Amino acid sequence: MAAMLGDAIMVAKGLAKLTQAAVETHLQNLGLGGELLLAARALQSTAVEQFSMVFGKVQGQDKHEDSYATENFEDLEAEVQFSTPQAAGTSLDFSAASSLDQSLSPSHSQGPAPAYASSGPFREAGLPGQATSPMGRVNGRLFVDHRDLFLANGIQRRSFHQDQSSVGGLTAEDIEKARQAKARPESKPHKQMLSERARERKVPVTRIGRLANFGGLAVGLGIGALAEVAKKSLRSENSTGKKAVLDSSPFLSEANAERIVSTLCKVRGAALKLGQMLSIQDDAFINPHLAKIFERVRQSADFMPLKQMTKTLNSDLGPHWRDKLEYFEERPFAAASIGQVHLARMKGGREVAMKIQYPGVAQSINSDVNNLMAVLNMSNMLPEGLFPEHLIDVLRRELTLECDYQREAAYAKKFRELLKDHPFFYVPEIVDELCSPHVLTTELISGFPLDQAEGLSQEVRNEICYNILVLCLRELFEFHVMQTDPNWSNFFYDPQQHKVALLDFGATREYDRSFTDLYIQVIRAAADQDREAVLKKSIEMKFLTGYEVKAMEDAHLDAILILGEAFASEEPFDFGTQSTTEKIHNLIPVMLKHRLIPPPEETYSLHRKMGGSFLICSKLKARFPCKAMFEEAYSNYCRMKSGLQ
């Protein structure tokens, strides 16, 4: 009882102090000072005295508890420092370049500040491994316990994505400035964090273990479909009356969608990669509800337990890999289809991101793809012909290459060299000493993925999207090597540096000039809206045999010409209002039914990248002219080709 009352005293005193600070701030803001301010202080002091008298006996009965509570409250009171508005030196410094002597001592840094890179173009002001407040360094400290038991015993606590900025006495004007600073995207630091829905679950390594998960999914989908039919609640039309390609299966209930996501996030690997590919499709192609479910798949998979993750690192980097690091965050800040990413700080203070591949993923690609396709086909979730055997074979080969982190590191270095002088794009540096076939380490960058960029200004969104489309054309027609994964999380925008970091080069592939020589002529004909030229070049490229029925020929030509619309007009192309995806969606059933031969293998990844880039422009509602960018790419290509001859 005494302990409870002691706590009550501490809370009441704290509330009294808070009330005093609030009253004084409001009186000062209203221009009412002098006697009213003194009266408020007198009332507060009287209240504290009366409260102490009431509980005096209780305090006397248990001096130990009282002294403990008082001691803790005095420590708290000393560190909160509620300065009055009229006190000298209470104004906040909102400059990002505030003096370092106002920051926290380095001894209280609890691991790296994952929001920022300590090197490279995204370096922030402040101590190494320490986050910089968007409001700059300020006077005073807020709830900093210098007698932390962990620190007293020499143990470095981990605090994930902590903000180490400090706050002093606040005036009404300071609060308003802080609100305005928070509202400005340019002044806000950005951090990448693991999805709150991600769970720690062991990756099933053996094929039998993975097969068991797919078997459980198949049974669950069947039960869910029966329940859905029994409820008679299927809706095959969305709110606009437009029917989506994947919106025709009784297996596609909410419960079944969750079953799919849960299984994919657990097994990860090739099956999850296929789900992520579906997540970046337009609503015209995929059921909007399923698209939202797969969005969770795209943002974050589940992550490995510590024991499984450590075993992978010991196997790949050797048992002494920690000797190269000053700090390693055991909880990942990102998890995807093939691996998860951890924060670390090297001995010299450099912050890095370590991507660790899930065990068993590379060895189970074929079985995973077969198992997932069997489940989806059994449940009739995909239209017939959407993933023909030829495409499945291409996906298997691409996923096998993506599991080779040494290959990815080589392509990252290649792109870093190609774009070293680019004013807008940046490729993080590879840290070779912490790389292996299953571990890839790069410098840490800051920013946010492009699916979170919708709140940026129209001008900034236009610039981002314009540069992405120009890069696509340069990759194909100038570099002849392209990063073909258009996942939004592979583009990180940093508003402080006004740069986009390019990530994940596992899906990179090269294109022969024999292919690009013909393909650029197809785009040229589409930009000119020349139907006959598109048909001729499509037959040359073996998109068509020349013996297709008229419906198939027209559908193919219409699809190519629709894609060429953006490059056809000198006027700004409004990606936000265009109906490109809907038009192509309407052509898909015809092409699936009447196609005689599969398209060239190179076009699967190429069109995935081009289509994904257009979708980014659409999501960000970009608006800018595209004809000039293609004309420049075409002229440069022809000039380069003539120089080689």
UniProtKB/Swiss-Prot annotation:
Its main location: mitochondrion. Present in various tissues (at protein level). Autoinhibited by the N-terminal domain, containing the KxGQ motif, that completely occludes the typical substrate binding pocket. Nucleotide-binding relieves inhibition. GO terms for molecular function: ADP binding; ATP binding; enzyme activator activity; kinase activity; protein kinase activity. Its EC number is 2.7.-.-. Keywords: ATP-binding, Kinase, Membrane, Mitochondrion, Nucleotide-binding, Transferase, Transit peptide, Transmembrane, Transmembrane helix, Ubiquinone biosynthesis. A motif (KxGQ motif) lies at residues 273-276. The keyword Transit peptide applies. The chain crosses the membrane at residues 211-227. Signal peptide: none annotated. Pfam families: ABC1. A motif (AAAS motif) lies at residues 334-337. It is found in: Mitochondrion membrane. One of its GO terms (biological process) is phosphorylation. Residues 1-159 form a transit peptide. Homodimer; homodimerizes via its transmembrane region. Interacts with the multi-subunit COQ enzyme complex, composed of at least COQ3, COQ4, COQ5, COQ6, COQ7 and COQ9. This is Atypical kinase COQ8A, mitochondrial. It comes from Mus musculus.
